[in-house]
């Protein structure tokens, strides 16, 4: 009996005030058996990556005669963490804008063509002067006066019928070459000069039947060798 009393006495310290056995718990709330009972270790299962809720420990204590067996089931189930399925994709920005604007300038079709007369103005200035005229003058003086030139010719030796052959240098009209000037063309026409030989054949047949003579006629009479030219 004493053995049983010692056992019961030892067990009385593990009962509450009503005689019910008291289950001792650890710092996590899991029951600890005081006798030869088996204490089940709370199994912990954690799911998810975020912090889950605190687990709930359900302890079921059953006391049998002579056997203090406490089986604790700790089902500490953590909350399942949500999966971050929001990938933020940056825009690839593969829009390659092709600036293929090849601006073609309008071809300049406004060439200023200078005159093809590259300074060679064609002034074929062959100016032809008036052709020399041969004048036959027959003067018959039936009056008193003679001209001045007639009187001089009478006093010159051998000029009874003096044939004057004057080689004059008659200048023809200057030929002007007209150059058609287009844009920026400068053509110069050379002025041509034509030389004309004038030949004048003057034949004087003088018949004088007057009385008075002019001044030049008197001068001619005074010249030597001219007495045969005049007659009174």
UniProtKB/Swiss-Prot annotation:
What induces or represses its expression, per the UniProt entry?
By abscisic acid (ABA) and water stress.
Report if keyword Transferase is assigned. Answer: no
Annotated Polar residues bias: 1-14, 159-168
Domain of life (superkingdom): Eukaryota
One GO cellular-component annotation of the UniProt record comes to:
cytosol
Instruction: Mark out the compositionally biased spans (Basic and acidic residues).
Output: 140-157, 198-223
Question: Compositional bias of type Gly residues: which residue ranges?
Answer: 49-60
Q: Which family does it belong to?
A: Belongs to the plant dehydrin family.
The name this protein carries in UniProt is Dehydrin DHN3
Which source organism?
Answer: Pisum sativum (Garden pea)
Taxonomic lineage from the root: Eukaryota, Viridiplantae, Streptophyta, Embryophyta, Tracheophyta
